[in-house]
């Protein structure tokens, strides 16, 4: 709908330039745009599919556990708003500075983003860990659902801290056109760490949502290590090419 409205405005509004049918065609820039955007789109698609798989693992534990996980997921989505916003703004800011030839400021922005994210992440961590049951209780009055939701949040809580680091690094690499690497490290986290760990924890006797929730911060920590190693490699490669 927004695209249609934009097109109507372009047609009706007096612009300082003209648009013709010939302007809408494939050009050499399209390949570059696809090279940047497709890896991110694929990663996002597979990440969402992994959440469906995680939901299936939890559903094996029964209706109460599934309901608790569903309620906890709402709180998780809210907790991830600030890291996600930092990642998106980081990518734009870094890209502008890289385009201006100011790589030093781009690196500083990544460190600043990590610092800001950690402040909010630690605050959310304490809130979720100490008052997670109160937060879950906002969405469900059932004490068993509240208990199960709180169990998951206790395992997930460290994710609010480590995500602040990972998302700022991901935003930095996105701004430097390293989207293929961003996709690669995301798939490694999801396919090789998060899903196997969550599945393994879900099939244990007396499976705990806390241990299943831990799969998120563990996989994110692996992602941080991978990104640090790639940052060192990429920085050396960039200096050598210059």
Q: Positions of the model-derived regions?
A:
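Short runs within selected transmembrane alpha-helices of multi-pass transporters and secretion channels
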Residues: 1-6, 84-87, 156-175, 181-193, ...
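Short alpha-helical transmembrane segments in multi-pass integral membrane proteins
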Residues: 1-38, 94-159, 202-242
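Hydrophobic faces of transmembrane alpha-helices in multi-pass small-molecule transporters and flippases
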Residues: 2-5, 25-53, 57, 78, ...
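Interfacial/gating helices of multi-pass transporter permease domains
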Residues: 29-36, 40, 57-77, 143-150, ...
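Hydrophobic alpha-helical transmembrane segments of integral membrane proteins
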Residues: 35-36, 79-80, 91, 192-193, ...
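Transmembrane alpha-helix boundary and packing residues in multipass membrane permease domains
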Residues: 40, 44, 52, 56, ...
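Helix-terminus/linker motif at the lipid-water interface of multi-pass membrane proteins
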Residues: 45-78, 96-97, 134-143, 202-204
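Small-residue-rich hydrophobic transmembrane alpha-helices
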Residues: 68-132, 163-185
């Amino acid at each position: 709908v927004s695209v249609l409205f934009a097109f109507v405005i372009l047609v009706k509004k007096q612009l300082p330039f003209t648009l013709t049918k010939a302007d809408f065609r494939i050009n050499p820039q399209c390949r570059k745009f696809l090279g940047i955007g497709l890896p991110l789109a694929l990663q996002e698609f597979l990440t969402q599919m992994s959440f469906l798989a995680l939901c299936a693992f939890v559903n094996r534990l029964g209706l109460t556990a599934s309901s608790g996980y569903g309620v906890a997921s709402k709180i998780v989505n809210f907790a991830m708003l600030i890291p996600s916003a930092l990642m998106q703004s980081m990518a734009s800011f870094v890209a502008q500075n890289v385009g201006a030839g100011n790589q030093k400021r781009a690196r500083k922005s990544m460190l600043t983003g990590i610092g800001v994210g950690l402040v909010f992440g630690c605050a959310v961590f304490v809130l979720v860990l100490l008052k997670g049951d109160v937060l879950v209780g906002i969405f469900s009055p059932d004490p068993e659902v509240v208990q199960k939701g709180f169990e998951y949040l206790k395992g997930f809580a460290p994710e609010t801290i480590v995500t602040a680091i990972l998302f700022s690094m991901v935003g930095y690499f996105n701004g430097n056109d390293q989207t293929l690497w961003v996709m690669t490290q995301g798939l490694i986290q999801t396919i090789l760490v998060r899903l196997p760990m969550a599945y393994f924890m879900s099939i244990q006797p007396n499976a705990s949502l806390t241990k299943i929730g831990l799969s998120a911060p563990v996989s994110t920590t692996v992602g941080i290590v991978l990104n640090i190693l790639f940052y060192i490699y990429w920085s050396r490669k960039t200096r050598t090419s210059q």
